[in-house]
Amino acid sequence: MVGAYYVGIALLVAGGSQTAAGVDQYDLEQTPDNGFSRLLALDEMLRSRFLRKSRNPKDNLMLSEANEERTPSSPSNSLTEFIVSEPITTNVMRTE
């Protein structure tokens, strides 16, 4: 019974290899790419087009070479220091 099982497996393997060998290689080369290569070309074109520095002098966004994204040129200009007066902090603290 075990021998019949091994013979059946051997026949399935042999039949599968003949089927794989019968595939025409020309048909594999002619398969459509579903636009994948066109999408890669479009992605490269968009990346090179939109990561340029703006010619508009009012635009304060510059190209950051570290991460290749448009970022504000100086984030420290928009940050201001918030100073909390001492009486407010003492009123907030609870004493137990």
Curated annotation (Swiss-Prot):
Residue span of region Disordered: 57-96
Domain of life: Eukaryota
GO cellular component terms attached to this protein's record: extracellular region; host cell cytoplasm; host cell nucleus
Compositionally biased region (Polar residues): 87-96
Compartments where found: Secreted; Host nucleus; Host cytoplasm
UniProt signal peptide: 1-22
Motif RxLR-dEER boundaries: 49-70
Main localization (coarse): secreted
Keywords annotated in UniProt: Host cytoplasm, Host nucleus, Secreted, Signal, Virulence
This protein's record includes keyword Transmembrane helix: no
Domain remark in the UniProt entry: The RxLR-dEER motif acts to carry the protein into the host cell cytoplasm through binding to cell surface phosphatidylinositol-3-phosphate.
Family of the protein in this entry: Belongs to the RxLR effector family.
Free-text function comment from the UniProt entry: Secreted effector that dos not suppress the host cell death induced by cell death-inducing proteins.
Protein name: Secreted RxLR effector protein 123
